[in-house]
Amino acid sequence: MSGNTYGKLFTVTTAGESHGPALVAIVDGCPPGLEISLADLQHDLDRRKPGTSRHTTQRQEADEVEILSGVFEGRTTGCSIGLLIRNTDQKSKDYSAIKDLFRPAHADYTYHHKYGIRDYRGGGRSSARETAMRVAAGAIAKKFLATQGITVRGYMSQLGPIEIPFKTWESVEQNAFFSPDPDKVPELEAYMDQLRRDQDSVGAKITVVAEGVMPGLGEPIFDRLDAELAHALMSINAVKGVEIGAGFASVAQRGTEHRDELTPEGFLSNNAGGILGGISSGQPIVAHLALKPTSSITTPGRSIDVDGNPVDVITKGRHDPCVGIRATPIAEAMMAIALMDHLLRHRAQNADVQVNTPVLGQR
């Protein structure tokens, strides 16, 4: 199956299914000499892993990553980095009743038509379980970007109808929702408790921000940085929309409001989300992701079986009532991977480019 590799100079290839023996990633193109440890990777994996609160799937996976190659005495060698996470808490029997049915709004129907065979256990390859390897690979990218003064951070900005204003980065890591507003957490918990009683699911919005990105990243025309970020972020399970900067709000803006004016002291706004003409401007890069409600719920839904007969489908098993709750580390990982790839591509072509114009920040 193609489409398992992302990137051009810094590439990430993943393999594995939700209920298979393990998940695997091959990370290629990382420069040699980068200090890296299991703890660097495990930190973000622990932020993403299931079973950490009552508001996520109760599947218990330690998600302990193993580094198989490409690292020697705590430093990258420049060779391919092999990563592995073993699956330890599969309950495949939960899915035996739906092996010949198609769950509404799930990938069952489309995988069946594309390949003629599918792993029905937990969604197989289409499961968000695969994103554990992206997070592990993304931790390598984040470590490299940090050596260049670049940080990538994210937070939940909306859960269902509840909008979450940004207050502090410190709050993000202090609750299960990655909420930047601690005062919103009780409301989010109450909403999720009621959602569970209703046997339903809900969507979410995640915001991810990269700071310290130098001007010049992005390869027009078809590899514009915003196009590449949209590609990377849209590849995450359940993501149905991506905005860069003001995004769809720019439809209602006038040019006098939307344009990010420049002064010697810096840009006056950042409606462009840190990208102009497909190239980073030096401002913070800001992206927003819309994640749909998970389709795996216990409320019956109409569908068909493999023979086309009408059926009612009830999905058993352990599922996230809101996949957005664990999506923040995944979004950070994909943005970091995309930025590292473009940073290396920029170096390859433009390392000797020098201009006298100062780099502007945001006032």
Curated annotation (Swiss-Prot):
Membrane-crossing residue ranges in chain numbering: none
GO molecular function: chorismate synthase activity; FMN binding
Cofactor(s) this protein cannot do without: FMNH2
Reaction catalysed by this enzyme: 5-O-(1-carboxyvinyl)-3-phosphoshikimate = chorismate + phosphate
Residues reported in the UniProt entry to bind NADP(+): 48, 54
Pathway(s) where this gene product acts: Metabolic intermediate biosynthesis; chorismate biosynthesis; chorismate from D-erythrose 4-phosphate and phosphoenolpyruvate: step 7/7
EC class of the enzyme, as a word: lyase
The protein's name in its UniProt record: Chorismate synthase
Gene: aroC
